[in-house]
Amino acid sequence: MSAARQGVAQARRIVVKVGSSSLTTAAGGLDADRVDALVDVLAKSRSGGEKEIVLVSSGAIAAGLAPLGLRRRPKDLARQQAAASVGQGLLVARYTASCARHGIRVGQVLLTSDDTSRRAHHRNASRTLDKLLAMGALPVVNENDTVATDEIRFGDNDRLAALVAHLVRADLLVLLSDVDGVYDGDPSKPGTSRVAQVHGPQDLAHVEIGSAGRAGVGTGGMVTKIEAARIAAAAGIPVVLTSAVHAADALAGRDTGTYFHPTGKRSADRLLWLQHASTPQGALTLDDGAVRAVVERRKSLLPAGIAAVEGEFTAGDPVELRDSEGRAVARGLVSFDAKEIPQLLGRSTRELARELGPAYEREVVHRDDLVLLQP
């Protein structure tokens, strides 16, 4: 066993993500046998008492299709949310029944992007997951599809899993799919080879990656899984991407699937979301002095350094920070509504406090809520 795979076998806190295609029948409904098989693997891995597992599970929308008379996953958000509302209860009930066979309690955790970005939200989410693990429960995490909007959705549970792995300080992320890892071509065709290890983007430069999920029941394809692996690896978390039928081998550290080596160090949970999974709701154009302050000196963005504002956003939304030539240099959580900023442009905080009141004597984007973007 390689050192990397030995590290996988020795991981104590693990986030496992399973997609809709690994939990459903060909018709799109929940497959009880598949759910039971996955739970059996997770229960065995936990049985020694040394491992903690968080399960990020898709399948709520897929589970709600048949009860609502839908043949395929709808494209519009409203019907997706209706299906999720019906299906989430069915999904958790199935997990609860399956886990009960092993004496394991299930704790449902529904997250939105706010829960990994806003200070109070992500702190509470982290505490809840920590407490569930400490009490021996199996947290089952999903995006809260019924309340998320197009603008603030994670979009797929692969990215959510990467962010949850960072949120709970996991030692390992396992992404389960219906494909045994990354291949250098169509895995259904002869002559293609599995990519056993990925140290960086150069190892995937020759790989053509498809994006479609199976049977129209999910949103995730190989593109989103590789992106999730990249996010987690950049945060210092190793990743194994393999098929659900090889979940036991993956958790045991055997040579299955594709192993992504960590490429970076851990950062604040909110900043990981901000850099990799947020959708900017607007943009602020900075003058040259503000660009240097933000990029080179890692300072907060003050009103005096802003030359222009665009977009419609509210305080707490992610926005893009651009230089005078329109290049994105950073991303941050803004402290003001878009409609408030025009009156602040180019003015000092002292002047604003004197004219508008002390509430305006603050940063537009605080340095703790800001990430630099790679050129």
Curated annotation (Swiss-Prot):
Its EC number is 2.7.2.11. Substrate binds at residues 58, 145, 157. Residues 281-359 form the PUA domain. Keywords: Amino-acid biosynthesis, ATP-binding, Cytoplasm, Kinase, Nucleotide-binding, Proline biosynthesis, Transferase. GO terms for biological process: L-proline biosynthetic process. One of its GO terms (molecular function) is RNA binding. It catalyses: L-glutamate + ATP = L-glutamyl 5-phosphate + ADP. It is found in: Cytoplasm. ATP binds at residues 17, 177-178, 219-225. Belongs to the glutamate 5-kinase family. Catalyzes the transfer of a phosphate group to glutamate to form L-glutamate 5-phosphate. This is Glutamate 5-kinase. It comes from Streptomyces avermitilis (strain ATCC 31267 / DSM 46492 / JCM 5070 / NBRC 14893 / NCIMB 12804 / NRRL 8165 / MA-4680). The gene is proB.
